[in-house]
């Protein structure tokens, strides 16, 4: 976890800071797993039509790859925009 996120907690006892850091870590893990599961579900649903064999055919594999790349690029852009908005709110004019 980025310790600078806890900068406003300087007045708290060290034990509470540690507890807050652990909570933030758990939330980040939960959000990462949620994003991964969403990616898998979306790309699988969009790209895999039949269950003829154990492996994906070339068309399915290509579709999954493109889908995952789009999803990750979109997620990164949303995260960057969110950070920009948060930075604008945190910085007084």
Curated annotation (Swiss-Prot):
One of its GO terms (cellular component) is mitochondrial inner membrane. A motif (Twin CX3C motif) lies at residues 43-67. The keyword Cytoplasm does not apply. One of its GO terms (molecular function) is metal ion binding. It is found in: Mitochondrion inner membrane. Coiled coil: none annotated. It comes from the Eukaryota. The keyword tRNA-binding does not apply. Keywords: Chaperone, Disulfide bond, Membrane, Metal-binding, Mitochondrion, Mitochondrion inner membrane, Protein transport, Translocation, Transport, Zinc. Transmembrane segments: none annotated. GO terms for biological process: mitochondrion organization; protein transport. Its main location: mitochondrion. Disulfide bonds join 43-67, 47-63. It is a peripheral membrane protein. Heterohexamer; composed of 3 copies of TIM9 and 3 copies of TIM10, named soluble 70 kDa complex. The complex associates with the TIM22 component of the TIM22 complex. Interacts with multi-pass transmembrane proteins in transit. Mitochondrial intermembrane chaperone that participates in the import and insertion of multi-pass transmembrane proteins into the mitochondrial inner membrane. May also be required for the transfer of beta-barrel precursors from the TOM complex to the sorting and assembly machinery (SAM complex) of the outer membrane. Acts as a chaperone-like protein that protects the hydrophobic precursors from aggregation and guide them through the mitochondrial intermembrane space. Belongs to the small Tim family. The twin CX3C motif contains 4 conserved Cys residues that form 2 disulfide bonds in the mitochondrial intermembrane space. However, during the transit of TIM9 from cytoplasm into mitochondrion, the Cys residues probably coordinate zinc, thereby preventing folding and allowing its transfer across mitochondrial outer membrane. This is Mitochondrial import inner membrane translocase subunit Tim9.
């Amino acid at each position: 976890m980025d310790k600078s996120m806890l900068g406003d907690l300087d007045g708290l006892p060290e034990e509470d800071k540690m507890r807050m850091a652990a909570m933030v870590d758990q939330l980040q893990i939960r959000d990462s797993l949620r994003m991964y599961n969403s990616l898998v579900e979306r790309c699988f649903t969009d790209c895999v039509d039949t269950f003829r064999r154990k492996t994906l055919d070339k068309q399915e594999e290509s579709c999954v790859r493109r889908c995952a790349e789009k999803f990750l690029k979109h997620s990164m852009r949303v995260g960057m925009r969110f950070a920009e908005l948060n930075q604008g709110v945190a910085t007084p004019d």
